[in-house]
């Protein structure tokens, strides 16, 4: 009997270790489909393994979000000109992220809006935030009535445009849905000094829900020194960053380097490449693809 019990205890320990590896001890990873600007591309990227997408948002002269459009130049090997009217895209996105909808994609849990605010004057940033919130509330969140469930990151390229965040928040509050800010996170995407990014969040009055991007077009190489600085901030007791993502990663070797550096998200034109690396024995033990149950605003503690 003792022998049997001995085996049983070894087996249960092994099972426990498996469970821990399956969830708690593995870093959840967001595979972020890059430049998903046409509704048809949502399914295309998710079916290749993306659990997150990045969508460009261009503005008109009055700071209204207008198109999901990148334009030329863009990443090597991509069509830069695909687009939708912003509100049409939001409706398509809502279908893809609303349980019960025939177009529902359960795996799609995070959307990064790459806000092309470079066309705006600095004093239009607050207004752009308000108008963005109005559009999302109506066409994505369905005025708070069983809308899309994905978490949203507002990615701003210019630190001077931090008032966009306040405009966005104020508008949701004014329209009676401040609780939707629970679903909203932030990113400054200009590769600025990490200290300067921290100062911009202080001015904006933001703590928490912070993703930090680092990267460059896939046409050019870029080292990991700033990623390492962002990860160090995230992992320090007094850091302000919750998650770090790296863009645009299309090669297996770069994917491994980024994972080894400890990123939480990898933006890519080829989600299947990232998926393949995550399935390699060395990485399967340490990482897993994030699901809806993984709160993207919570810092993962090793």
From Swiss-Prot:
Record note on cofactor: Binds 1 Mg(2+) ion per subunit.
Entry comment describing in which tissues the protein is expressed: Expressed by the venom gland.
Disulphide bonds in the chain: 74-80, 76-219
GO molecular function: lyase activity; metal ion binding; phosphoric diester hydrolase activity; toxin activity
Positions of Mg(2+) binding: 54, 56, 114
Principal place of residence: secreted
InterPro entries, per database record: PLC-like_Pdiesterase_TIM-brl (IPR017946)
Protein location: Secreted
Stored CDD domains: GDPD_like_SMaseD_PLD
Residues annotated as signal peptide: 1-14
GO cellular component: extracellular region
Enzyme class, first EC level, given as a word: lyase
Matching Pfam families: GDPD_2
Reactions performed catalytically: an N-(acyl)-sphingosylphosphocholine = an N-(acyl)-sphingosyl-1,3-cyclic phosphate + choline; an N-(acyl)-sphingosylphosphoethanolamine = an N-(acyl)-sphingosyl-1,3-cyclic phosphate + ethanolamine; a 1-acyl-sn-glycero-3-phosphocholine = a 1-acyl-sn-glycero-2,3-cyclic phosphate + choline; a 1-acyl-sn-glycero-3-phosphoethanolamine = a 1-acyl-sn-glycero-2,3-cyclic phosphate + ethanolamine
Organism domain of life: Eukaryota
GO BP term, pick one: killing of cells of another organism
EC number: 4.6.1.-
Cofactor: Mg(2+)
Propeptide residues according to the Swiss-Prot or TrEMBL record: 15-22
Similarity field: Belongs to the arthropod phospholipase D family. Class II subfamily. Class IIa sub-subfamily.
Protein name (database record): Dermonecrotic toxin LiSicTox-alphaIA1bii
Organism: Loxosceles intermedia
